Amino acid sequence: MENLENSTDCKETVSPLNNSGSILNSTVSRHEAMGFVLVHAGAGYHSESKAKEYKHVCKRACQRAVDRLRAGGLALEAVTAALLELEDSPFTNAGTGSNLNISGEIECDASIMDGKSLNYGAVGALSGIKNPVLVARRLLSETQKGKLSAGRIPPCFLVGKGAEQWAVSHGIPACPTEKMTTKFSLSGYKRNKRKMELAEQVETKRRKQSSENDFGCLEPVGDIMVEGEENNSACLDTVGAVVVDREGNVAAAVSSGGLAMKHPGRVGQAAHYGCGCWAENARDVSLYSTAVSTSGSGEHLIRTMLARECSTAMQTENAHQALLEAMQNKFISSPFLAGEDCVLGGVIVLRCCSCGEAQRSEDIQALLDLRRTGESQHNTDCYVTVGVYAPNICICQPMFKTLHKGRTSGCAQLNHQTSGVSMEPYYREHVCGVHVCPGQ
């Protein structure tokens, strides 16, 4: 047996398409408890040249969460630890290295939800704080303490300057934007700024020509944010994690720097209730506990409340089919997105159930499903790392799949079984991740 720090290094060749076999098959004492950690670095525009860095940061995030679980921490502590690692990486669009808005500032969104208490904390358009998830976590913790003086209700969601002031007043240190800006995010900002200026010049010229020649309606200039070969900074990605601890509690969290060149004050799905993440312990033995984290275009995910929709779908017996149907019916074909040419979204879902004595000898199974359908208008990457944890078994297996331009369809699966692992009570985990980018 090996722990996470000594487990097999990340391998570049791992893919859901070429590795559908078992990645773990070991036996653990039935009296040993376990947990499960799943993290992602987002569904967005990733640089292939940084694939190694993306995989390494996901591995480190799994390690941090596992360390908390080993120390007896609950799911909420573990998911926070994973997000801190993701936010601290200069290669993710969260915390340090986040996309800059049109004013050249960093404004971050983050939220966290505890499945045990059902409490939630979130921040939006937050500047001046290195780790937005810490503020979201503190907001969640404060709501658990009850009402404030004079019977005031404590906030669970703060934005902008008020969120920054609240964070500092609660002992979270401030961090200026220049210290959170990396050379990659700054170069991306300058490149996009030049594109915007050029587009405005072209548009002004066309309008003048149209007015003089009465040409009527203008041709659209085009999407200046479409990624070129030289531009790897146009990230839609929201990083996130879902965790179940040894007691069966689930938790989920997300964090994002938002769209590149966004308007100041814009808040994406990472902060919205039921849109960025969802976690809910089963309240009945006939129900499943679920934890969800989403990534993609914030506006699309907000209008469909995808995180909560996926959680609801997981209450059916066939988790795999239910998730695919939820993505199709509640997202791709959603009437709330009927006017969109291309909807962009991804989701990781963890579900677990407390099983009876007769089921304790069954395998613990996890399914990761990457599905893409329709016509992809851009190169879209999805980085997902699966981290499986038990006291004597710990594995971190990164997976990378690129959705290329043109029509792509089908389904790729990765299955693994851990034989003979049991708990008090016994839990069975199902993990599904879906990334979708359909065209018209």
Regions found by a protein language model. Give the residues of each.
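Alpha/propeptide regions of enzymes that mature by internal proteolysis
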Residues: 2-440
